[in-house]
Every structure is written in C-alpha cells, then in structure tokens.
Amino acid sequence: AAAPDIPIANVNA
C-alpha cells in the first residue's frame, strides 16, 4: 500500500 503510517502494516515495496 502507498498510504502513510496510519494503515496497519502498510508495505511500500
């Protein structure tokens, strides 16, 4: 996911 800190375990690969 490209979203900032707030999402749970957002993986910006």
From Swiss-Prot:
Per the record, GO CC terms? extracellular region; membrane
GO MF terms listed in the record are: beta-lactamase activity
Extract one GO BP annotation from the record: response to antibiotic
Major localisation:
secreted
Q: Where in the cell is it found?
A: Secreted; Membrane
**Which keywords has UniProt assigned to this entry?**
Antibiotic resistance, Hydrolase, Membrane, Secreted
Which of the seven top EC classes does this enzyme belong to? hydrolase
What is the top-level taxon of the source organism? Bacteria
Known EC number: 3.5.2.6
Q: Which reaction does it catalyse?
A: a beta-lactam + H2O = a substituted beta-amino acid
Name the family. Answer: Belongs to the class-A beta-lactamase family.
- What's in the misc comment field? The class A beta-lactamase family has a specific amino-acid numbering system, sometimes called Ambler or ABL numbering and often misspelt as Amber. A multiple sequence alignment was used to derive a consensus sequence and then the consensus was numbered taking into account insertions and deletions. This allows use of identical numbers, e.g. for active site residues, despite differences in protein length. UniProt always uses natural numbering of residues, hence there appear to be differences in numbering between this entry and some papers.
This protein is called: Beta-lactamase
Q: What is the lineage of its organism?
A: Bacteria, Bacillati, Actinomycetota, Actinomycetes, Kitasatosporales
